[in-house]
Amino acid sequence: MFSARLVLVFAVVLCIQLCNASWLDERAMTQEKRCNGKYQKCTSNSQCCDQKDYAKRKLRCLTQCDEGGCMKYKQCMFYAGTQK
């Protein structure tokens, strides 16, 4: 039959594998792709969250401008113009 030492080694190896598996799952969850919400900086539309406002407008990566000029960076905002 199996010796006590062999059973102990098997138990330790199994424990190490289970610990590594749970650590990898936690790491994968933290590296999950995150999206940017309203008014957060972005560089492309794909970085903005896939959410819609009350008028069913999607978040887009846009440069905000007013009479004084435009901002130097883009933000995720709901586009008020026509969308297809």
Swiss-Prot record:
Q: What is this protein called?
A: Toxin NvePTx1
Modification comment: Contains 4 disulfide bonds.
Species, as recorded: Nematostella vectensis (Starlet sea anemone)
Q: Name one GO cellular component term.
A: extracellular region
Keywords from UniProt, A to Z, are: Cleavage on pair of basic residues, Disulfide bond, Ion channel impairing toxin, Nematocyst, Neurotoxin, Potassium channel impairing toxin, Secreted, Signal, Toxin, Voltage-gated potassium channel impairing toxin
Q: Which family does it belong to?
A: Belongs to the sea anemone type 5 potassium channel toxin family.
* Residues annotated as signal peptide: 1-21
Its taxonomic path starts at: Eukaryota, Metazoa, Cnidaria, Anthozoa, Hexacorallia
Residue ranges the record assigns to the propeptide: 22-34
Compartment annotation: Secreted; Nematocyst
